Amino acid sequence: MLQQRTLKSISRAVGVGLHSGQRVELTLRPAPVDTGIVFRRVDLPEPVDIRMTAEAVTDTRLASTVSTGGAKVQTVEHLMSACAGLGIDNLYIDITADEVPILDGSASSFVFLLQSAGIELQKAPRRFIRVTRKVEVREGEGANEKWASLEPYHGYKLSFEIDFDHRVVNSTGQRVEFDLGTDSYSRDIARARTFGFTKEVEYMRSKGLALGGGLDNAIVMDDTKVLNAGGLRYDDEFVKHKILDAMGDLYIIGKPLLAAYTAFRSGHALNNKLLRELLAHSDAYEVVTFEDEKRAPRGFGEVARAW
């Protein structure tokens, strides 16, 4: 039987929010079977739990924000991506502010935190959402067109293409494919950092955003080059970060997907729209378990590989 997974012990981190610049303490704790992934705002007078569901997403400007009532948590996608990549089903995330710390701008620090705590197999079957027919969402036309789709696939595969008119991005490749069954999330995706341009950063800061961003937690470019002294971590780091984001956005659905995800210029808003489109059509998916691990897709039967 493919079993649900949580952590063996508690893991903690301290950082700053990318947009707020505010100090944030994060505590990752084991959770019982069928809990799902739950953010707990412990800084509020009465702690508030926000459980990950597609409907919990209430804002997708610059990041994915989840909320319930008046409580929210922003920029959840990198931590959710790490949970997806390592196959964590049940987790409590205590947080002392309304934004997940950006740490190094990728998911690698979250992978380290999760793996440091250890992964515990639980006595309950892991439930998957298996896509049974193609679902697609589109926006815009011509040069502004963007789209994302999910199709049936015995496993989990993501293909992403970006379209940035910048000499550095053009030279590194704008399309990548990642298959959870044959590739390593920790090695191939997790270290890809968020990126931005100096003009954008200046504008966002004038609006009170990106206050915690800098060269230590993002790739920053001017009109011609990367400004980070160490350069890129991957040749195709830009589009790999889009895969990282997509994995986090899609894992908000609350269960691992069995599907092929394909996207062109998609972002947080379109990814969430895709999840809602899927859930709106009961004939497009089914919830499955694997009593016989040999019948499970490759890559799901083993605890996530280390670095």
Swiss-Prot record:
One of its GO terms (cellular component) is membrane. Its EC number is 3.5.1.108. Transmembrane segments: none annotated. Its cofactor is Zn(2+). Gene3D superfamilies: lpxc deacetylase, domain 1, lpxc deacetylase, domain 2. HAMAP family: LpxC (MF_00388). Belongs to the LpxC family. This is UDP-3-O-acyl-N-acetylglucosamine deacetylase. The gene is lpxC.
